[in-house]
Amino acid sequence: MTGAAAGMRAACAPILLIAAMALPLAATAQPAPNADPAFPFAREVEAFARANASGPALRDATLFIGSSSIRLWDIKGSFAPIATVNRGFGGATTPDVLRHYDRLLPPAPPRAVVVYVGENDLAGGASPQDVARDLNMLLRRLRADYPRARIACLSLKPSPIRWTLWPKMAQVNRIVATRAGALRVDMIDVGTVLLAPDGLPDASLFNPDGLHMNPAGYRRWTRLVTGWLRQDDAKPANFPIDPKSSNIITDRKTVKTGQGDLG
């Protein structure tokens, strides 16, 4: 071996050693087989699909579907003895729910459906018009699949950390509310109950992250949704709604509106 060749081999040795050491690290860094690099919550959706395939089908349950505001809600405890199915997953956008729609739905048709999604869409840069379009697409699909179920869409909520997005959220709420009646969907205003007397989000109702609600905030949502579910006992599942208006349910009353603001 020439002196030049020996010198080159000596110079390359540290590089080869580093590369060899990096191989095990690279192997451990590989994503799980069911992980989608563009969708970090694939495991949650996979768990829903397994539950659908193996678990008992709950008849006449209330399906809650959407993002982390649904996932973090103690739905089973909050609405007992009503049978419930929680299909919320963290960080979900409306396109995510539409993409995984078939894997999220329970095997038995629900008696009622409660939807909350769209907030993360806006946080990701989507326009209010696009969010409302996707949300209406989801509501239309749910209505087509469950023609006799009652469906409620929860208005996008204000929060301390996303307060700058509130004007866009209110715009989404207005657009969806004006079109909900034709789909026989009730719009429940869950935002007003989270505001303090000064009109700003009440920080005492949120976790330290300023985004997700604490138990006190969820109790306010539970009261509203419980009131809506109790209406189900007095009306048939396919009760008629004026297609020119929508039901906006607030903490105080139900308002019929055609162009109303959720406030």
Where are the predicted features?
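Hydrophobic positions in alpha-helices of CheY-like receiver
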Residues: 138-142
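N-terminal secretory targeting modules
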Residues: 1-64, 75-78, 230-263
